């Protein structure tokens, strides 16, 4: 699979994460800035968020870990893991600075766990499947999921706006 396709998918996934985490899948990006209330929780797993939200945070970062491995095989596990952690922390800091939603250490932890699982899942899968085939499967499924997300959001917007 070409580097252009895999790097393009990683870039699209990063944009999707930004859209999802910071802008809550809103088409009107400015609407998230109407929140005007800062909320900061530094005690893990105690905020008013529900269990489902924590699971969702883990799930949305698993593909990110997978795509980091597809695109940056020459970089070791720890730098990629650190990047996932820093990205998640950056999202939460941006949410706090601009008063977008709630800033929660639990989100940093669950996002990072998701990225960790993606990184490890790739390593485990790589032991049982040819690397090129694994990369193709990840890229194909990634493209399919991004298309489904866009169709889902477009459908919601058309039918419910």
Curated annotation (Swiss-Prot):
Function noted in UniProt: Unknown. Confers low-level resistance to teicoplanin.
NCBIfam families: vanZ-A (NF033125)
Subcellular location: Secreted
GO biological process terms on file: cell wall organization; response to antibiotic
Cross-referenced InterPro entries: Teicoplanin_resist-assoc, VanZ-like
GO cellular component terms given for this protein: extracellular region
Record flagged with keyword RNA-binding: no
Name assigned to this protein: Protein VanZ
Lineage: superkingdom: Bacteria
